[in-house]
Regions:
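Aromatic-lined, polymer-binding surfaces characteristic
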Residues: 1-198, 202, 210
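N-terminal leader/propeptide and maturation segments of large enzyme subunits in energy/redox metabolism
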Residues: 206-244
């Protein structure tokens, strides 16, 4: 009942965007904060879905579309509204805004046909993020090398990949029996995470560029891969080290 009350209340707001981003030209309606709100909204909507009347489902779905779905997918994915590309901000902004919007779209697709269409666009575009070849003019390197390593240090790499995989797993769960599109980089991620960790007595350390804490780990990404059926012994070793 509380989740239902919260959802019916928050959809009355004018915007979920941040004041700083809304002041930009052009206006940025969706940032990392709004992407997280989209994710939380999707979880909440799914949790109370069976307890809502048909009119409440529609009302909440339309409100979440206006406040979160349209900004995330409109700014980051869908034409003609899109103002961003794969190399806007850090690369992980794209997966966060696009994929959290995609998860919300999956949650709303029973009520809103346009949400289902939006989720399909995100799903089809997702491999492009992993294949990003870099941008010479903006001095941005290729995201993943041939051996599976990412140019970001562990903290930011894990965040961007985790956002992508949460959407991919949600897509797989809502499309049982449909073979997911192949993303070759996923098979090599565990090797990357193992090679940038620093085994020691006690909590696992990782190597970084001074942009995160040495105790940050990537078990969330590996658990998502494992749930998708992408498994190997390195993953189990790594997750066991983190557990200890």
């Amino acid at each position: 009942d509380k989740l239902k009350e919260i959802l019916l209340d928050v959809i009355k707001e004018d915007t979920w965007g941040s004041e700083e981003m809304l002041a930009r030209i052009p206006v940025w309606r969706a940032d990392l904060g709004l992407a997280h709100k989209a994710y939380l909204s999707a979880i909440a909507y799914d949790a109370v879905y069976n307890d809502l009347s048909s009119s409440e489902r529609k009302e909440i779905a339309e409100g979440l579309k206006r406040l979160a779905l349209d900004p995330c997918l409109g700014d980051w994915v869908l034409e003609p509204a899109r103002i961003h590309s794969l190399n806007s901000m850090g690369h992980n902004w794209w997966t966060s805004c696009a994929c959290m919007g995609g998860i919300l779209a999956l949650s709303l697709q029973n009520e809103l046909p346009e949400a289902k269409q939006g989720a399909e666009v995100v799903y089809e575009a997702l491999p492009q993020w992993f294949d990003f070849a870099g941008d010479v003019l903006q001095q941005k390197p290729k995201s993943f090398d041939a051996d599976g390593g990412m140019y970001e240090s562990l903290n930011y790499a894990n965040f961007g990949i985790q956002e992508a995989l949460q959407f991919r797993l949600a897509w797989m769960n809502t499309h049982p029996g449909q073979k997911p599109v192949q993303i070759p980089q996923l098979d090599k991620l565990s090797d990357f995470f193992v090679h940038v960790c620093y085994p020691r007595t006690g909590i696992l350390y990782n190597m970084n560029f001074g942009d995160s804490h040495k105790n940050v780990t990537a078990e969330s990404t590996l658990m998502l891969l494992y749930a998708m059926g992408i498994r190997n012994d390195n993953m189990l070793w790594y997750m066991n080290q983190v557990e200890q």
